[in-house]
Regions:
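A charged N-terminal "starter" segment
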Residues: 1-105, 111, 163
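Active-site loop/helix belt of alpha/beta enzymes
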Residues: 8-9, 43-51, 55-60, 115, ...
């Protein structure tokens, strides 16, 4: 398969989808059946081709997808992809309309984002699912402490069309041989999730963390660079680039 990004300057990359299929299957076997595999296909699947990589991942063991922006989710829906799609980025007014219309799962972490989504839901007369992002040490977006989690939950209680179905965080340093900070982040995440309703989808581990820390797999992992064959270590899975 040859991948050319829209509006590129004619450059292309020859992608071996058999390698991606192999990697997804290998990771799927390693995780076991109790852990969902979310394939991260943001940024045109890291330059590998959004649609073919997403389809290949879903055909070989991924149960859902993650993108950075709602526009990427819309492209997947237009290509016929019906699997759950999580938007990892922050809520914007325009993006909220797309997430609601296309049935995407939107990341939220503060009252402003929840209200923006509720307004879009009300205009379209349909609900939207959300996952609550918790910043446990990465230093990007996310509710950072119990007060911010309470504020987000209060906003959700006032937004009947915005439905909380999951929560997640991201390890800042998962490939560091010293795993003490990763363990600290995980403990902080688990403490904050005690404030949330039971039965949510919880995910903390991305590629390296999911392979290195079985204790961090919870009920979902996000696989990005691993499915493209280039984690810091393939942990004996013989992943193919």
């Amino acid at each position: 398969m040859i991948s050319a990004y829209p509006d590129s300057r004619g450059t292309c990359v020859r992608v071996d989808l058999h390698a991606i299929a192999h990697n997804v299957r290998a990771i799927r076997r390693e995780l076991g059946e109790q852990v969902q595999l979310m394939a991260v296909v943001k940024a045109n699947a890291y330059g590998h081709g959004l649609i073919p990589v997403a389809q290949t991942a879903l055909q070989n063991g991924a149960s859902c997808l993650a993108v950075a922006m709602p526009e990427e989710g819309r492209r997947l829906r237009e290509a016929g992809v019906q699997a759950p799609i999580l938007v990892l980025g922050n809520v914007t007014a325009a993006g909220a309309e797309i997430s609601v219309r296309e049935g995407l799962i939107q990341t939220v972490f503060d009252p402003a984002g929840v209200r923006c989504l509720q307004n879009a839901c009300a205009r379209q007369n349909q609900p939207v699912q959300v996952h609550l992002k918790l910043d446990t040490g990465m230093g990007r977006i996310g509710a950072r402490d119990a007060d911010e989690v309470r504020a987000a939950l209060a906003a959700l209680a006032d937004a009947p069309l915005v439905r909380l179905t999951g929560a997640f965080t991201h390890f800042a340093d998962a490939d560091n041989p010293d795993d003490s900070f990763s363990r600290e982040q995980f403990a902080r995440f688990m403490r904050l999730t005690e404030m949330l309703p039971a039965g949510l989808t919880l995910h903390a581990a991305a590629s390296d963390a999911s392979l290195r820390f079985p204790w961090a797999r919870l009920n979902m992992v996000r696989e990005g660079i691993a499915i493209y064959g280039c984690p810091a270590d393939d942990y004996g899975l013989h992943l193919r680039p």
